[in-house]
Amino acid sequence: MERLLDNKFSIEDVHEESLRPKTLEDYIGQQKVKEKIKIFIEAAKKRKEPLDHVLLYGPPGLGKTTLANIIANEMGVDIKVTSGPAIERAGDLVAILTNIGENNILFIDEIHRLNRTIEEVLYPAMEDKKVDIVIGKGPSAKTIRLTLPPFTLIGATTRAGLLSSPLRDRFGIIERLDYYTVEELSQIVMRSASILKCDIEKEACIEIAKRSRGTPRVANRLLRRLRDYAMVKHTGSITYEVAKSGLEMFEVDEYGLDLVDRNILEAIVYKFGGGPVGLSTIAAAIGEDEGTIEDIYEPYLIQEGFLVKTARGRVATQKAINHIAKIKFNVKESGDKR
């Protein structure tokens, strides 16, 4: 079953390509990053040069891929999209690099997952526009150095710390994308609803934004599910009341936490006395993968002040303890009424 608040890319997101902004002007949020990128693009165009290599990092779902496509659009060049896990051999990367058109963009998502051997192919390509290919095998094999046309590499990662220093140092532009504000997300929801031809109240947009974990991808996914809910259970319009009842049915609370988030906090608070407790122990307690907890759930819980990461393990904050106690009380109260 798909996790509604998952900020990872899903197949459904492919079908909502129309929701992606195409220009910096339409791109909502990340104001400081946008201002800098706009200057870099204008300067590159005036010099008639490709944009310097760009590294975009930050939590999933914040618009790194969208921004890469916007940069290509603003530069008036083509973009080739691939990902770290998809490039399995050095030859795969060489083939991509030798087929890039002049001043075009190569976008590598999850660039931190590139194999180190493959990564080394990028070093001369990024610095000197050169790439080495080996022809033949054994003692008779020869290395030929090819010259590449000028190009821009845009790398995106959720784990900037996993990038090797030699690779990271070759990016001239490094920008972090941060979580969005409620106001920014509300604007994104309103824009998406307009594109989807979905009738929605401003208050409903704000309610969706509050529960979207600071992430546009989550906001758009909640909007699509509420569109279904409003169509089947109500008149089709998403009012504040419809949004609130739908989100409650989807078990997304006022902080944007879902059942898995609450399971993590409950385990720390009730099973381990509030912590500190190790990641592997939490994973075993709730039946979830360690990497999934660390990459998908923890960043938002830490950002919102529910969790603290210490050398001895994870610790639940007073905010988390109060929130979990409130949920338990509400569940007990509704059970007593029945």
Swiss-Prot record:
Pfam families per the record?
A: AAA_lid_4, RuvB_C, RuvB_N
One GO cellular component term? Holliday junction resolvase complex
Listed InterPro entries:
AAA+_ATPase, AAA_lid_4, DNA_helicase_Holl-junc_RuvB, P-loop_NTPase, RuvB-like_N, RuvB_C, WH-like_DNA-bd_sf, WH_DNA-bd_sf
Instruction: Give binding positions for DNA.
Output: 309, 314
Gene Ontology biological-process annotations: DNA recombination; DNA repair
Binding, Mg(2+): 65
Which residue stretches belong to region Small ATPAse domain (RuvB-S)? 181-251
Q: What is its EC number?
A: 3.6.4.-
Give the multimer and partner information: Homohexamer. Forms an RuvA(8)-RuvB(12)-Holliday junction (HJ) complex. HJ DNA is sandwiched between 2 RuvA tetramers; dsDNA enters through RuvA and exits via RuvB. An RuvB hexamer assembles on each DNA strand where it exits the tetramer. Each RuvB hexamer is contacted by two RuvA subunits (via domain III) on 2 adjacent RuvB subunits; this complex drives branch migration. In the full resolvosome a probable DNA-RuvA(4)-RuvB(12)-RuvC(2) complex forms which resolves the HJ.
Note on domains (UniProt): Has 3 domains, the large (RuvB-L) and small ATPase (RuvB-S) domains and the C-terminal head (RuvB-H) domain. The head domain binds DNA, while the ATPase domains jointly bind ATP, ADP or are empty depending on the state of the subunit in the translocation cycle. During a single DNA translocation step the structure of each domain remains the same, but their relative positions change.
What is the name of this protein? Holliday junction branch migration complex subunit RuvB
Give the source species.
Answer: Caldicellulosiruptor saccharolyticus (strain ATCC 43494 / DSM 8903 / Tp8T 6331)
